[in-house]
Amino acid sequence: MRLAPSAVNRQPWKFVVVRSKEAKEQLWQAYDRDWFRTAPLYIVCMKNNSECWTRRYDDKQHGDIDVAIATEHLCLAATERNLGTCWVCNFDTDIMSRLFPSADFEAVAIIPVGHIAEDCPRTEKKRKAIEEIVEEI
């Protein structure tokens, strides 16, 4: 994730590793699901709004994109090490703002990380055909 590309190399991110029991219990308030509580650790992927690059032609801010790229690097690295991850973004933003109070930083995703249980059901991922997503002009 540290080597992930970002717009104008701003690297507008911070990653908070949540490992202690107390911190996990606070995090669970923002996303209260049974399966989510089973992870041994979580990584909260934060965007630094004051460091994000903005495209001048349409004022599109690229912070979420940059954090997403770095976060996916993290998920791919975990997968390479036979660890499971899940992208969680349906969390309570008010609770997250209270847990991580900062004028500049905002949570983009929470990534639970852990070993995949042997009895975990494995479903085949449904992906669009390459012809549906790639166009040559």
Could you tell me what each predicted segment is?
Residues 1, 43, 58-99, 111:
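Small-aliphatic-rich amphipathic alpha-helix that forms the alpha element of a beta-alpha
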Residues 35-42, 101-122:
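A glycine-rich helix N-cap at a beta->alpha junction
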Residues 10-13, 80-83, 108:
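Short secondary-structure junction motifs
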Residues 51, 109-137:
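C-terminal helix-cap and adjacent tail motif
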Residues 20, 97-98, 104:
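Short Asp/Glu-rich motifs
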Residues 3-70:
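Glycine/small-residue-rich phosphate/adenosyl-binding loop
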Residues 47, 90, 115:
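Short secondary-structure boundary segments
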Residues 4-7, 77, 103:
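Histidine kinase transmitter module recognition
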